[in-house]
Amino acid sequence: MQGEKHDLHHEFPEFNDTIHELKMTDNHFARLFDEYHELDHEVHRIETGAENTSDDYLEERKKTRLNLKDQLFSMLKAHAA
């Protein structure tokens, strides 16, 4: 949905404890988490009209966000297993 934030705690509520644990213990996860959070914030600002960019730029940012989300989800599942 346009303008909706996609932070990981809302996307994966079942992993809230795991997200917190990995942010504290896994530097790679923490870096990807921070990158995802910043990117999600940027996409949200663009979608709500706070920033103006081309449609191509927005789509590229969304694809990057999705790629990061997939990586983070894989790490969450692996840790929970």
Language-model-detected regions and their locations in the chain:
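Extended, charge-rich alpha-helical interface modules
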Residues: M1-A81
